[in-house]
Amino acid sequence: MKFLHTADWQLGMTRHFLAGEAQPQYSAARREAIASLGEVAVAQGCDFMVVCGDVFESNQLAPRVISQALEVMRGVGVDVYLLPGNHDPLDAASVYTSELFLAEKPANVHVLDTAGRHQVTPGVELVAVPWRSKAPTHDLVAEQLDGLPADGTRRIVVAHGGVDMLDPDPTKPALIALKAVEDAIDRGAIHYVALGDKHSRTQVGSSGRVWYSGAPEVTNYDDVESDPGHALVVDLDESGAIRVDAHDVGRWRFVTLRWSVDNARDIADLGLNLELFPDKERTVVRLALTGTLSVT
């Protein structure tokens, strides 16, 4: 059984440093990334796709953004399971309960709006951990793992948020406790943990079964977001053995270029390096210059 793990589409996102035609082109690229995810899923023989939170940038979006997103999802060749995250929680203003979303939601799109176990195929369950507010007061994942049986069912946890090992902050009560996750893996209650929230592809712990897929299209500069633009294809066989493969889907780059400038040659070299950037129409460069130049 194969599935595609993705997260953090944040459809409707705007970037303050994109001007003119760049912003609509970037927005279109984020929608096109969904189509690319569908192509990967079909080509790799995936049974379904999980989107682990922050599908939308917020719950307050222009109707056009919602309609365009659902239309792209309609064309994805597999079932798509959407998890509400911190940007689009299941609160009173949730996009997922809006009249527009419910009226236009395609048959292949399913919202994981109830915490707990959801059968997707015989012998395979998703353990959904949706956000109902922007600030949970406890570890939502540990709550769902408590008492989960090791009964031979292959289970994928679909969750969103930070993990205590990566962000050990005692002031954040909603952090996911890695020990509870790894204990559930060790006893055979769960077999993979699909995470969203971190926009760079990241393996968590040493089990090989806990991953952030990262965002399918870049959202920040590379000194902040080191490895975006991927989706993960997860192959989980009947024995519980697993294989995780990354596939590139992103097309944009947000690059921080640090350069020392002390003379005319340095300026010329900088210009040459900028000229050599490929795909300039999809590359944003932030310059960080150091050095001393004469005013004459």
Residue ranges and their predicted role:
Residues V40-C46, G75, D151, P278-K280:
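Glycine-rich phosphate/diphosphate-binding loops that line cofactor/substrate pockets in enzymes
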Residues M1-F3, E125-W131, V234:
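Core dinuclear metal-dependent hydrolase active-site scaffold
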Residues M1-Q68, D146:
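N-terminal active-site segment of His-dependent metallophosphoesterases
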Residues F48, N59-W211, A215-N220:
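His/Asp/Glu-rich metal-coordinating catalytic cores
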Residues E32, A43, L236-T296:
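Accessory, non-catalytic peripheral segments of nucleic-acid enzymes
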Residues S200, V204-R209, S213-S226, H230-D266:
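Glycine-rich, Lys/Arg-enriched anion-binding loops that position phosphate/diphosphate groups
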Residues G53, A159-G162, L289-T292:
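Short, well-ordered beta-to-alpha junction loops that form the rim of enzyme active sites
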